[in-house]
């Protein structure tokens, strides 16, 4: 009987006491509206402590590399940020536009990935649009000579040889039979074909007479 009375007394005294947290030993405090997400982040960090150490950005950053490859274009690498939710965490993930990676693989009969010896030669690539804006020449200027771009050429003179620009239209320089006109030096021991043809014609003429 005495034990039951003591139990009721103890229960009444514990109910009158404020509710305390068993782990912290502090009374609960009211949180502001801005502080409502802090316990969720703390709980997620306690459950997954390694989430804060995982880099959530892409390994391949093409923006600074393109700026180094083509500094004259003056392009600024544009990035897009997309929210990524992991439990209670809100992380901004950076994604570069116009880059679509393609991963090619081949599965076996039972859904297992084949080894490199059994796989054929498969290429992986990146589809990149507008790699160098302003750096691609139009088709009309692709084969233009840089020495001729400053001056204006007449019609039909794009592929004119500079040695024959001074000659009249329709007349091309013809060989006169002498080596001095073209300043051609024939190596010793090699006879020009024109001299051989002339000797053959003179011998045939002498044989006819």
Curated annotation (Swiss-Prot):
Processing and modification events after translation: Phosphorylated by FAM20C in vitro.
Keywords: Amelogenesis imperfecta, Biomineralization, Cell adhesion, Glycoprotein, Secreted, Signal
Pfam short name (any one): Amelotin
Disease named in the record: Amelogenesis imperfecta 3B: An autosomal dominant form of amelogenesis imperfecta, a defect of enamel formation. AI3B is characterized by hypomineralized enamel that has reduced tickness and exhibits structural defects.
Gene assigned in the entry: AMTN
Predominant localisation class: secreted
Record's signal peptide: 1-16
Domain of life: Eukaryota
Function (record text): Is a promoter of calcium phosphate mineralization, playing a critical role in the formation of the compact, mineralized, aprismatic enamel surface layer during the maturation stage of amelogenesis.
Residue segments, region Disordered: 142-209
Subcellular location: Secreted
Descriptive protein name: Amelotin
